Every structure is written in structure tokens, then in C-alpha cells.
Amino acid sequence: SKFVITLVVFSLYSMSFASTPPIRQELGNNWQFRQYHIGKWLPAEVPGTVHTDLINNGTIEDPFYRDNEKHIQWIDKADWEYELRFQVDEQLAGQKHKQLVFQGLDTWCDITLNGQPLLSTNNMFRTWKADVSGLLSDKENILHLRFRSPIRQGMKEMEKYGLPLPASNDQSENGGMGPNRVSVFSRKAPYHFGWDWGPRLVTSGIWRPIFLEGWDDLNIEQVFIEQPQVTPVQADLKASVRLTTEHHEKLIAEVKCDSRILAKSEVETQPGENRLTLPFTIKKPRLWWSNGLGKANLYTFRIDLKKDGKVVASREVTTGLRSLKLVRRQDTQGETFYFELNGIPVFAKGVNAIPNDVFLPRISRSDYEKMVTDAANANMNMIRIWGGGIYEDDYFYELCDRHGIMVWQDFMFACTPYPHDPAFLKRVSEEAVYNIKRLRNHASLAMWCGNNEIYEGLRYWGWKKKYAPEIYQQMLDGYDVLFRRLLPEKVKEFDPGRFYLEGSPYEANWGRPESWKIGDSHNWGTWYGQKPFETLDTEIPRFMSEFGFQSFPEMKTIRTFASPADYDLESAVMNAHQKSTIGNFLIKKTMGIYYHVPEKFEDLVYMGLVLQGHGMRHGMEAHRRNRPYCMGSLLWQLNDSWPVVSWSGIDYYGNWTAMHYQTRRAFA
């Protein structure tokens, strides 16, 4: 049963997430794994991946060293199994309700508990939960996970769908798959299948934590704070609380901040799910500001539900109060595209980010801290989470909240049409709802964007000529269903105050100057167009959401993956760490325009770094000079997922390139 309870609260602040109950037991130790039904069991790390567990056990060599990547493509063709034997903690064993929570499984996984089927998963971008109240033993429990090959499962899904899809970034040939690009048929990080800056290392495994949780009669499931109107004078807010209980009972709801009770009201619950709506107002709120505009003020609140004076459920939340919107308004020059924070138009100084590692569980909290502080210290105020990676860890968004970094959040779709059969749409719907609910309380979240470059691809990348009319029409239909219907409907339902952008870019195309007057632009003229950097002075869009130029990482990074015998642009190892087909040629060609091309490899690497920094500073300063016509400059890209020749300003080991230093100057 569902019951809606409306509480009028006199004063309250705002929220983002951490709870006291339920009781939690982490299940991260004493795992073992092996290839399915083959060989002996080996120790495993959880969270982890099959690849990293094989590395840790000495079964394979470092995939990042020299050209080892090509020697381990067999891993993604096999099934793998993980097993844990555990006992339930005494305190948790006494709870009435118990569930297993899998925060991230990559990707196709069949789960049993004590021999009983529990779940079959098909999406790495969401949490999976299972009620295990009647399945747990008071002695030893056996949790077993079988990960199906993402390649073989992808082939099955492709055959069921019955239509080919481009997925040009899927390095299927490198993986021994010929033309079979299966990445689009699994809800799995696209970049794992390869990109023009990344290797093909298609992982499986428990990539986020698993835990057992238990509670008795009452559990606060979620708290969401909507901010219908926030001004320096007053913030009108609305808190929505979802809780489950077994009983019809009267409770006292209290809202606290700094141990002070801000609101107190009686709540009458019914068995099942209950929803509480709490409207409230704050006078003269301390507003949240982006980096460079002011302080990123945050409030921490606690909601307590009490029975007979005792706290029976609690949820603590932190967020900031602000008005943040994307302004798209027709003007005499076309249509504006800028972010407005607390009534102030903001020039977005920022960058596109990819995942910090191919092997996601390797990314630590300190890695995220360095990522966000490096952006803030370079005077940035925005990071775009690009649609070919992952929805980032909660801690990343918490850091952006603290440092005043606005987040442009893509849904995880990039550079290719996608299926739109009912089963696929169901997976996408569940993924979207989960991540919208998970992230919507973050003050830093500026907007949702449906995809990266798919509409541009449909219009300009030759798919219409390459494919039969009926297949191309299916691609158009799939785009319409996913990005014009399903995703905007979910944003409207679960995060109604946030702007949804269909795709990036939508109107503008770097080869068509007449289109730059509307929307955001990805200008790849200085790379794929092989134009000089000076063209950035005149090719000015309303908002530059991608532009870039490659460089080598510095020599100390190259030494981690190559030996001196490999120090040649045409060596097999250097080519293995250069995923752009024109990359090394174009770096050398452009260097010859602006500088003398050194003969010594180490000098060539150094001058490549100088070249990248010079060219990209040229673009950033041109965008800022053309304010307010142009209101954003987002570099491609911030970081790397392995040691590689790429467009990044910070290499895999965290070293700033010349471009990042030039960014700090250009954005000052």
C-alpha cells in the first residue's frame, strides 16, 4: 500500500544522503574466483574485476605495459565465477528484514545464495537488491556469482535485435571479433570496448561494494529536496520522504540542523510504503556558488522519526541551496546557451572527464579528490561527465558540491545509435530512474544530457548512405524513443527542476559555420579538420562543449609502459598506446607549423606538450574574449584511463601537462 502524508514544516534546510539504520554488514573480504568450472579457486578482491584479480594472482602481465593489451583478449570470451562463504553478524541476524545489496555488477551475472537462485543482472549502471530474509542460514552462507562473457552475451543480444549498429569506437577487430561490434547491446561502460584514447579491456566483476543490510519495523528509503524557487531573500523548498513500515502507528518527525530542532510534526503511517511531503521556507539562505563566484555553502540536516521518544529511523543529508538553469533563448544572433546561477549568467570554464581508470575499482577516494581539486585549482567551474564512461561514484559529486564545480551529466550513450526493443528500453528506464534518484540532491548537478554526438552522427557521419533505408529509419526511431521520450520523461518525473538537453551537440556542427549560432558545439577542426589553431579565433559557437588536441604524456609516464627500444613514433608499442589513427602524424605535422621538429624522441615529447598547451590556450582565450556571445569553454579532456597519447591535461599518473598549466592561466 502507498500512502501520501503532507506535513507543513515551519523551517528546514536541504539534503543529500547518509542513514543510521539499517544495520549494514560489508561483504568485501574472503572472496575467491576462477574461470567458470575450470581450474582452482584463487583469492579475489571485492570490489574488483576479473582482469585485476588475474593480475594480482600473477596469471597475466600488466595489460598497460608495452603491447600486452592484445595478448589478453581471451578473458572477455570466458565466463567467470566468484564465491563467498560468510556468517551473518549477530546484531544483523536479529533484524526482521534482510536484503543483499549489490551496488555494481559488471554486467551479465547469475546469483545464487545457498544454492537458491537470487538474481540475474543485465546492467552495470545500477544497484541490485534482493530480499534474503528467508534464505540466510544461522551458520555458513554461500554466495555465488557467475559472470557471463560480455562478448558472447552481446552476440546473443545482437542476434536477437537483428539489425547492425555502427559503434565505430568499438575496437572489435582488436578483440578478435571482426566486424561484430557488440558493445551497444549491453548496458556496460562503452569505453571498455575501446575508444580513440583507450584500450579494449572488456571487464567483468563486482565493481562496486556488496553488503547485507537489515532493519526491523521502519526504514527511510529516500529523501529528495526539490527547490522550486531559491532567491537571496527566500528559498521555497519541498522535501519528499519515502519510508516503509510494518505497522499503522503514530510517529514524531523531527528535522534538525546543528542539534537544533527546525521542524516537528506528528506522522500517522500505514503498513507498506508511505510518502511524506514537507514544504518549508528559509529566509535569507546562504546560497551555493560555483568556483570563482563565491562560497559553495552547504547545509547538513537530519530527519528523525521517533516513537515513544526513541529514534527508530533517521536520515542525514547534505546539499546546497541555489537556482541553477540552462538559458536557451532566441536573440538577434541565434539562440543563447548559458548557465545562470542564482540569477547570474556564468561563463562555464571547464573540461570533459572520462573514467580515471579502465579498471574502475582501482579508482580511490584520493584519486577523486585530486581530480576535483586539480580542476578547481585550474580555475574551472564545470566538469562534463561524458556519455561513454560511467555515472560517477557518489564521492565525486560530493566533492563537486564542496568545491563549487558544476556537473554537466550525460546519460551513458555515445557516438552510435542504440537498440530500442522493449527489453533494452526496460533496462535503460531502470538505469535512468536509479541514477536520477541517486544524484538529484547534489547542488553541483547542473543538468542532464541524453547522449554524446548521436544526432550529429545520424546527420553527418554517413550512416544514411551506408545502411539500407529501413535500417536507417530504425536508428532514427530508436533515437526518438530514447532521447526525446524515455529519458526526458524520467527526468521530468523524478527530477523536475533540472534541465534536460537531448544531446550534445544538437544543432551545431564543426564543419558547418552557419550552425554555430545555436546550441553547444564540438569543434574538432583543429584535429580531424587539421586546421591551424588560429581558426579558433573565428570559429566561435554559443558554447564550446568539446575541443582538443593531443600530446604525449611526459617521459616519466612513457617509461612506465615502454622501454628505450620503443622510443620511436612508429614502434609497435608507441602505436599500441596511440589509439587515434591520425594521432602521431598530426602531432608531428602541426609541430612543424609552429616549431622546429626535434630529432630526439625525448625532445619531441616535450615539444608536443608545449604545442598542445599553446593551441588550447588559444581556444580558451578566444572563447572568453567573445563573451557573452560565447558562454562556455570545455576542453577535451581532463584525464586518462591508462598511460596513453591523448587529449588530456592530466595524465594517468596525475601529472599535469603543459595544457593544464595553460588552462589555469587562461581561466584566471
What residues fall within each predicted segment?
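Extended carbohydrate-recognition surfaces in non-catalytic/accessory domains of CAZymes
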Residues: 19-101, 180-209, 213-218, 235, ...
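Short glycine/proline/serine/threonine-rich loop/turn segments at secondary-structure transition edges
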Residues: 93-96, 136-140, 282-298
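Substrate-binding/catalytic cleft of secreted carbohydrate-active enzymes
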Residues: 382-402, 406-575, 611, 615, ...
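Beta-strand-rich binding/interaction modules
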Residues: 111-113, 234-268, 276-278
